[in-house]
Amino acid sequence: MSSTSSSQMVQLVADKHVRYILMAEKKKESFESVVMDHLRMNGAYWGLTTLDLLDKLGCVSEEEVISWLMTCQHESGGFAGNTGHDPHILYTLSAVQILALFDKINILDIGKVSSYVAKLQNEDGSFSGDMWGEIDTRFSYIAICCLSILKCLDKINVEKAVKYIVSCKNLDGGFGCTPGAESHAGQIFCCVGALAITGSLHHVDKDSLGWWLCERQLKAGGLNGRPEKLADVCYSWWVLSSLIMIDRVHWIDKAKLVKFILDCQDLDNGGISDRPEDAVDIFHTYFGVAGLSLLEYPGVKVIDPAYALPVDVVNRIIFTK
Ligand code: GRG
Ligand code: ZN
């Protein structure tokens, strides 16, 4: 990455991003907070993971986070986006990921949480997001990632789950949200991630998928999510993590992507936006920092492309008893 360190290149303003994340948490009356209230659990996961990648998780009160998190658990075992809301598989994964960051998985009634997730599997192997039944390969990934962290994959039919994901594969090598749906980088991350976690990557046509994914890089260096769309920092996560999982990351220009991400920073107040000059938000701050982690940017911890958690956390949770 020698060209990334040329003199005119802006640097990662890590301390400002840390301050931005800590402030975003405090500003409960802000417009962003009101709009995001129902998905606070997901926002907390993005913010806390970013802090951990920057080695600053110690700046938040673990006790405060965990006591709030536990108020979001529903009697079914699933977690809601905030206190008093309905449970959903996405917030359940976020809650489990946050507890993983703090090495506190064991405070959970693991049997109850894993049963909530397992009950969302359908006869054809697919997963619904909650009791209302929407089906999407996002939920297949979420279920598999969550149950893998909880070491409860045996509670679902993994073979059928994999078969359903493979039925969402397209001729271009990509994956969609349901069988026959158009390939999209976000869904590709979900399908490739779920296949990686279950040891099923042999179902992926790595060359055609790698080709489709590397075509997402535009002239300015940023990546888009499908043909004809604008580049967006979040695809530095969805596309790059997928390329890494299929060993094709060397097919894109990494230095140009680093520059695109760094150009999306608010150098004064911290935070990262979707593209240069747009307003920053907590999601794109995570995607930018996580993207830089995948690009081996100095000073950022290494993130696992399948679990979306720092590698040291994954090693602690998954690879120890
Ligand atoms: C733990 C990393 C992690 C994820 C949890 C929620 C989830 C599982 C995955 C979501 C995957 C997904 C579908 C991401 C895409 C989000 C997105 C930017 C959608 C908008 O796509 P388009 O194509 O619009 O409608 P753009 O903005 O690309 O022009
Ligand atoms: Zn985006």
Swiss-Prot record:
Keywords: Acetylation, Magnesium, Metal-binding, Prenyltransferase, Repeat, Transferase, Zinc
The protein's name in its UniProt record: Geranylgeranyl transferase type-2 subunit beta 1
Lineage: Eukaryota, Viridiplantae, Streptophyta, Embryophyta, Tracheophyta
Modified residues (N-acetylserine): 2
Cofactor(s) needed: Zn(2+); Mg(2+)
Cofactor note: Binds 1 zinc ion per subunit.
Catalytic activities: geranylgeranyl diphosphate + L-cysteinyl-[protein] = S-geranylgeranyl-L-cysteinyl-[protein] + diphosphate
Catalytic EC class: transferase
Origin species: Arabidopsis thaliana (Mouse-ear cress)
CC terms in the record's Gene Ontology section: Rab-protein geranylgeranyltransferase complex
Gene Ontology biological-process annotations: auxin export across the plasma membrane; embryo development ending in seed dormancy; embryo sac development; endosperm development; pollen development; pollen tube guidance; pollen-stigma interaction; protein geranylgeranylation
Residues the record lists as binding Zn(2+): 232, 234, 284
Gene Ontology MF, one: metal ion binding
Keyword Repeat carried by entry: yes
